[in-house]
């Protein structure tokens, strides 16, 4: 149990005990205790924690919330708990002000836990996170980049929260887009080998594909023209897909993302899985024929309209393949399946959950995290095109421009459902205006304190000999409170699929450190205070390091 959970459990039991006393003495009439909250209030003057139980009890007790709160506070037994005082605020919120004793337990625990601090070691459930899953038909764009940072950070958070996590990339190597890709590659090959052919109107026109075709010519020469067309097309697309997938793997690896599984959509076609799932849903009455095509009854599950799953030409749609893919996920034993999709896929969510339910699975086991668009800015102007390729800026170009750390941090700073304006100039700045630099600088600054201490022959006392109660300044206590929050932040971020919480958390912790650093000296003439502050600095460094590690960002010792 983490520090915050221990305190919350203690406060929760105190509230329950007071409610039971009130009922037994006929001071408050109620049938059952509602699910009340004890949480950190927004305003500091409202204490360390606030409880809303009185407001929730008002209706069934037929009493004013404030009157209920007054009864409960009178009956609360704070002895043996880290409670200094209890106040009632507003309509009936119960505010708890804690003493420092619980905070003074934090340093020893963090120091001993080190890189494990904030993390639950138990492997509770098996979770799959599927993210990026870009079409292997071009370079990785900013949407892919944001999805990569969000998905990988979320996977890191879930691992730290105690889940067994598998990262997966779904390779869209089948279907209509691959046909268009093949048409495009074949046309470019023929054009570059001197044949007069027209490029497909809806073809992929990126300059990167021309480079791939040149590599095909380097391997096979101009002789593919003489082969039967289907053989020629197969050679071209196999080469191109292999090269593109290799590019995706290497680029994402340079972004700090390494997948456990690369799953081929094509395999679902080849092993008959798609048609097996189609037949199963048809037998269950969820698929019907109309206008020459076959439709899934997604309206039965709250969708606006039914969806085609098998075209009139007998070819399954992308949605049908996706249904089969998701059944495969659950067949592999995942308790929880999470997809990170672009917001343009929002219309796909209801029908996907409906298909899962139609297959007999609990749709609550599937979560789909939608993310909004990214706009790149430089000097206040929107950057629409890459100077190098003439198309949209690619992830590898972004990494080259601002670095992996800045890119990952910027992509997860905002909630996934918020549009992201990415300031390229800010991301490159080596100043405290740059959020990732600000946090990394806090870590490096702490490391410099310890280097200075070593240079002066100063060593911290043994951990059990340090008097933590020397830490009395408000800046010191604020840091301790924030460090105590870290395990709960990990837990909440995992439950709510909110990776941005960790970026915000570590920014706040860095701000508290910088404020302390600007007002107080760590190395000083008071040995007891110096030891306590050195320990405070070390646990701050540990927590910043662990938070940055979750974000996939380096924690440098020097800057």
Curated annotation (Swiss-Prot):
Q: Where in the cell is it found?
A: Cytoplasm
Similarity field: Belongs to the class-I aminoacyl-tRNA synthetase family.
Q: EC number(s) on record?
A: 6.1.1.19
Q: Which GO terms describe its molecular function?
A: arginine-tRNA ligase activity; ATP binding
Locus of motif 'HIGH' region: 134-144
Report what the protein is called: Arginine--tRNA ligase
What Gene Ontology cellular component terms go with this record?
cytoplasm
Q: Which InterPro entries does this entry report, sorted A to Z? A: aa-tRNA-synth_I_CS, Arg-tRNA-ligase, Arg-tRNA-synth_N, Arg-tRNA-synth_N_sf, ArgRS_core, DALR_anticod-bd, Rossmann-like_a/b/a_fold, tRNAsynth_Ia_anticodon-bd
Give the EC class as a word: ligase
- Keyword terms: Aminoacyl-tRNA synthetase, ATP-binding, Cytoplasm, Ligase, Nucleotide-binding, Protein biosynthesis
Single Gene Ontology BP annotation: arginyl-tRNA aminoacylation
Q: In terms of domain of life, where is this protein from?
A: Bacteria
Give the PROSITE patterns listed for this entry: AA_TRNA_LIGASE_I
Species per Swiss-Prot/TrEMBL record:
Syntrophomonas wolfei subsp. wolfei (strain DSM 2245B / Goettingen)
Q: How does it assemble?
A: Monomer.
Question: Which reactions fall under this protein's catalytic activity?
Answer: tRNA(Arg) + L-arginine + ATP = L-arginyl-tRNA(Arg) + AMP + diphosphate
Pfam families given in the database record: Arg_tRNA_synt_N, DALR_1, tRNA-synt_1d
Query: Cross-referenced Gene3D superfamilies, in alphabetical order?
Result: Arginyl tRNA synthetase N-terminal domain (3.30.1360.70), HUPs (3.40.50.620), Isoleucyl-tRNA Synthetase, Domain 1 (1.10.730.10)
PANTHER family linked to this entry = ARGININE--TRNA LIGASE, CYTOPLASMIC (PTHR11956:SF5), ARGINYL-TRNA SYNTHETASE (PTHR11956)
């Amino acid at each position: 149990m983490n520090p915050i959970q221990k305190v919350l459990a203690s406060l929760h039991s105190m509230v329950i005990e007071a409610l039971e006393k009130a009922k037994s003495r006929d001071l408050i009439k109620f049938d059952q205790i509602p699910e009340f909250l004890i949480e950190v209030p927004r305003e500091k003057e409202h204490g360390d924690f606030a409880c809303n139980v009185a407001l929730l009890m008002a209706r069934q007790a037929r009493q004013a919330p404030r009157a209920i709160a007054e009864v409960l506070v009178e009956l609360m037994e704070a002895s043996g708990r880290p409670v200094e005082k209890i106040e009632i605020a507003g309509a009936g919120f119960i505010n708890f002000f804690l003493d420092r004793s619980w905070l003074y337990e934090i340093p020893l625990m963090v120091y001993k836990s080190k890189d494990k601090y904030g993390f639950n070691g138990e492997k509770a459930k098996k979770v799959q996170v599927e993210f990026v899953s870009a079409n292997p038909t071009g370079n990785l764009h900013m949407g892919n980049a944001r999805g990569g940072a969000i998905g990988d950070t979320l996977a890191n958070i879930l691992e730290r929260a105690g889940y067994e996590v598998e990262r997966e990339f779904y390779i869209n190597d089948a279907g209509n887009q691959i046909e268009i890709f093949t048409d495009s590659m074949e046309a470019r090959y023929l054009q570059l080998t001197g044949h007069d052919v027209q490029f497909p109107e809806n073809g992929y026109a990126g300059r990167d594909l021309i480079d791939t075709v040149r590599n095909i010519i380097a391997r096979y020469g101009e002789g593919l023209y003489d082969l039967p067309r289907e053989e020629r097309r197969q050679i071209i697309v196999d080469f191109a897909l292999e090269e593109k997938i290799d590019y995706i793997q290497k680029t994402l690896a340079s972004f700090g993302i390494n997948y456990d599984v690369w799953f081929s959509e094509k395999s679902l076609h080849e092993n008959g899985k798609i048609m097996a799932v189609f037949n199963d849903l048809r037998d269950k009455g969820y698929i019907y024929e109309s206008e020459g095509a076959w439709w899934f009854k997604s309206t039965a599950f709250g969708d606006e309209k039914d969806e085609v799953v098998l075209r009139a030409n007998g070819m399954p749609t992308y949605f049908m393949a996706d249904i089969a893919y998701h059944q495969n996920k659950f067949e592999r034993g995942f308790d929880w399946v999470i997809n990170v999709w672009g917001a343009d896929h929002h219309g796909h969510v209801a029908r996907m959950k409906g298909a899962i339910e139609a297959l007999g699975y609990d749709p609550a086991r599937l979560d789909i995290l939608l993310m909004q668009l990214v706009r790149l800015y430089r000097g206040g102007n929107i950057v629409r095109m890459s100077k190098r390729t003439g198309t949209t800026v690619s992830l590898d170009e972004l990494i080259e421009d601002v670095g992996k750390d800045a890119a990952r941090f910027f992509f997860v700073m905002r909630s996934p459902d918020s549009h992201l304006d990415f300031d390229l100039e800010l991301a490159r700045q080596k100043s405290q205006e740059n959020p990732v630099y600000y946090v990394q600088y806090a870590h490096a600054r702490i490391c410099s304190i310890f280097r200075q201490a070593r240079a002066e022959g100063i060593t911290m006392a043994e951990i059990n000999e340090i008097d933590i109660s020397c830490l009395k300044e408000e800046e010191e206590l604020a840091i301790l409170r924030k460090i105590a929050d870290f395990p709960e932040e990990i837990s909440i971020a995992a439950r709510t699929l909110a990776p941005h919480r960790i970026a915000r958390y570590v920014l706040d912790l860095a701000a508290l450190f910088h404020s302390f650093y600007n007002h107080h000296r760590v190395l000083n003439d008071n040995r007891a205070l110096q030891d306590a502050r050195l320990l405070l600095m070390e646990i701050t460094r540990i927590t910043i390091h662990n938070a940055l590690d979750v974000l996939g960002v380096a924690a440098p010792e020097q800057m």
